[in-house]
Amino acid sequence: MTEEFRHYTVLLKETVDGLQVKPDGVYVDCTLGGAGHSEYLLTQLNEHGHLYAFDQDQKALAHAKTRLQKYVDKGQVTFIKSNFRNIKEELAEHGVFHVDGILYDLGVSSPQLDEAERGFSYHQDAPLDMRMDQDAPLTAREVVNTYSYSELVKIFFRYGEEKFSKQIAREIERVREKQPIETTGELVEIIKTAIPAPARRKGGHPAKRIFQAIRIAVNDELGAVEESLEQAIDLLAKNGRISVITFHSLEDRIVKTMFKEYSTVQDLPPGIPVVPEEFQPELKVITRKPILPSDSELSENNRSRSAKLRIAEKIKSR
């Protein structure tokens, strides 16, 4: 693996094995990243099986093509540079309308976090960027310097669950009146200034929640997850499975709620003794509680500590 794209794959076996891979099946990795999940899945496919792999990041795609070269040569994998919110449209262009399994790893990949110039990290000084797709127009710099006080407060509360949202937004407003905020380092100092000293000393890095909130806003991450999951459930063939790894409560809530919605029997007209086919739920939830990383995985990769895996199975086609 190239040094610049070294990535630890979280919940590798649990995620892929949870799909109950059929050797001749059609599968989708919506978050290719370092290609760890894709590689493990491809080892379980025969010459009739196929994987479609999505990523917005050109570097991730280039790395994956090298890592998965033997499967590329066999024609078993197709790479798609697109946001996974376009899953249905993109697969339709390849003549694919039903698949046997879909997986999502919703964490920011380690190389993106570690690559200073991408602006995701609050540990390194870099231009305010935070775009997953480097061709996308909206950057963190634009959010920080042009969004109103009330817009910033809403983003920080909603996406970062930050209790000092108002103080931080007010400090951003004060600083940018004098000159634009250009770097992650400047933003970190502003956040530290706005948060009372006792609060800064507990609960991890003081900028963590704000950086998460801005990243989610820049990439419309929650909207993309919701849109994509709706399409993914529709794309699944009967008995097909979906595995989703989340890393914070906002994403996990979306997955949990959607799985519950699609696995619940609809309200029936009174007096019907048997649930008719049209009222049967589409999904069966496989994981009553989310699967968490093992102690051994946590000791190898501290970034996996907040990971949660949920799995569901399609039991009825629309």
Swiss-Prot record:
Its EC number is 2.1.1.199. GO terms for molecular function: rRNA (cytosine-N4-)-methyltransferase activity. Residues 294-318 are annotated as: Disordered. It comes from the Bacteria. It catalyses: cytidine(1402) in 16S rRNA + S-adenosyl-L-methionine = N(4)-methylcytidine(1402) in 16S rRNA + S-adenosyl-L-homocysteine + H(+). One of its GO terms (biological process) is rRNA base methylation. It is an enzyme of class 2 (transferase). SUPFAM superfamilies: Putative methyltransferase TM0872, insert domain, S-adenosyl-L-methionine-dependent methyltransferases. It is found in: Cytoplasm. Coiled coil: none annotated. Keywords: Cytoplasm, Methyltransferase, rRNA processing, S-adenosyl-L-methionine, Transferase. S-adenosyl-L-methionine binds at A35, G36, H37, D55, F84, D105, Q112. InterPro entries: RsmH, SAM-dep_MeTrfase_MraW_recog, SAM-dependent_MTases_sf. One of its GO terms (cellular component) is cytoplasm. HAMAP family: 16SrRNA_methyltr_H. Belongs to the methyltransferase superfamily. RsmH family. Specifically methylates the N4 position of cytidine in position 1402 (C1402) of 16S rRNA. This is Ribosomal RNA small subunit methyltransferase H. The gene is rsmH.
